Amino acid sequence: MFMINIACLIIPILLAVAFLTLVERKTLGYMQVRKGPNIVGPHGLLQPIADAVKLFTKEPLRPLTSSKLLFTVAPTLALTLALTMWLPLPMPHSLINLNLGVLFILAISSLAVYSILWSGWASNSKYALIGALRAVAQTVSYEVTLAIILLSVLLMSGSFTLTNLITTQEHMWLIIPTWPLAMMWFISTLAETNRAPFDLTEGESELVSGFNVEYAAGPFALFFLAEYANIMMMNALTTLLFLGALHTPLVPGIYTANFVLKTLILTIMFLWIRASYPRFRYDQLMHLLWKNFLPLTLAMLMWHVSSPMSLASIPPQT
């Protein structure tokens, strides 16, 4: 029974990821005044299936000089961790209700760095290694602000459980009192998922394809799926934190529809940003974090910790 529950979680995520690639190609196409995929199936709707068949039936080539074990394990680990992060999300029939769900998500997203590092190192290629080092530095740096913003928001809900956030936002979305944090969070999620304008790990102009340059066929598809699963996960988390989904116990379907709609809108914003902005320079990316976001988020955290004590003379609720 538990395996059926896991399958019911994983299969829809993988399907959503497959069609997200189609939505991205269509969106970018229309924004660049062209059609996008329109040959395979009606209006190109079967394009993701054709891509999957092509990638998984090709021979996965491996460079002779690469490290065999790590080269194979890295893409599998990337997808496994990307899917594991979905477990504590409060769905109508969630698999697991963790008391420390937020910490679990933070820990797993930190582990995801290893798959990128291993893939770049095991490829034994200069391009892949530079891409991997960039990705690791970028991801680890932006994790700092993500953690601080999470702490600031959780001080308002008073618990590390994700279901508590829904109860907290019954009357007002948390994006209203914490809009500066929400803006910094959204930009940090862009950097955390290595998306434009922070996609320096796969800078085509200088690194060909970044850390996955030596991967082909199935393993490449696994990295691709992991990246898009992470994007949707981060947007689902943003919805939970700042745009609390409407919840009525009598009609659980409303919660699901509300949650999915907001996540979709945020995901389309990711695609819109990709179509609109050029890539940042690496030093600008790091300056944005260490010189702008970090001092601001620390100041906001101190504000969230001190305001209950100063205004109501009560200690912060945990």
Swiss-Prot record:
It is a multi-pass membrane protein. The keyword Electron transport applies. It comes from the Eukaryota. GO terms for molecular function: NADH dehydrogenase (ubiquinone) activity. GO terms for cellular component: mitochondrial inner membrane. It is found in: Mitochondrion inner membrane. One of its GO terms (biological process) is mitochondrial electron transport, NADH to ubiquinone. InterPro entries: NADH_UbQ_OxRdtase_su1/FPO, NADH_UbQ_OxRdtase_su1_CS. Its EC number is 7.1.1.2. Its main location: mitochondrion. Keywords: Electron transport, Membrane, Mitochondrion, Mitochondrion inner membrane, NAD, Respiratory chain, Translocase, Transmembrane, Transmembrane helix, Transport, Ubiquinone. It catalyses: a ubiquinone + NADH + 5 H(+)(in) = a ubiquinol + NAD(+) + 4 H(+)(out). The chain crosses the membrane at residues 2-22, 69-89, 100-120, 146-166, 171-191, 231-251, 253-273, 285-305. Belongs to the complex I subunit 1 family. Core subunit of respiratory chain NADH dehydrogenase (Complex I) which is composed of 45 different subunits. Core subunit of the mitochondrial membrane respiratory chain NADH dehydrogenase (Complex I) which catalyzes electron transfer from NADH through the respiratory chain, using ubiquinone as an electron acceptor. Essential for the catalytic activity and assembly of complex I. HAMAP family: NDH1_NuoH. This is NADH-ubiquinone oxidoreductase chain 1. It comes from Myrmecophaga tridactyla. The lineage of its organism: Eukaryota, Metazoa, Chordata, Craniata, Vertebrata.
